[in-house]
């Protein structure tokens, strides 16, 4: 249940966030897609931990492919 709610909130962010913010991600997949993949693969707690760590790394000049 927590995973589904989290994924729905992330998808809401993906639809409502300004284009400038959404296009700023330097990683592939995007940080929000990475969070969804991590939640689906590793569950709520570990998935969010991985997603938050990824967001912390999302600073210039970092970037490139980074899969969960």
UniProtKB/Swiss-Prot annotation:
Entries under Pfam families matching the protein: YidD (PF01809)
Top-level taxon of the source organism: Viruses
Family, as annotated: To bacterial proteins yidD.
Name of this chain's protein: Uncharacterized 7.9 kDa protein in int-C1 intergenic region
Biological source species: Haemophilus phage HP1 (strain HP1c1)
């Amino acid at each position: 249940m927590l995973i589904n709610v989290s994924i729905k909130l992330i998808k809401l962010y993906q639809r409502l966030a300004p284009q400038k913010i959404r296009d700023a991600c330097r990683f592939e997949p995007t940080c929000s897609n990475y969070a969804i993949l991590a939640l689906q693969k590793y569950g709520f707690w570990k998935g969010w931990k991985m997603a938050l760590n990824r967001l912390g790394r999302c600073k210039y000049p970092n970037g490139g492919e980074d899969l969960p």
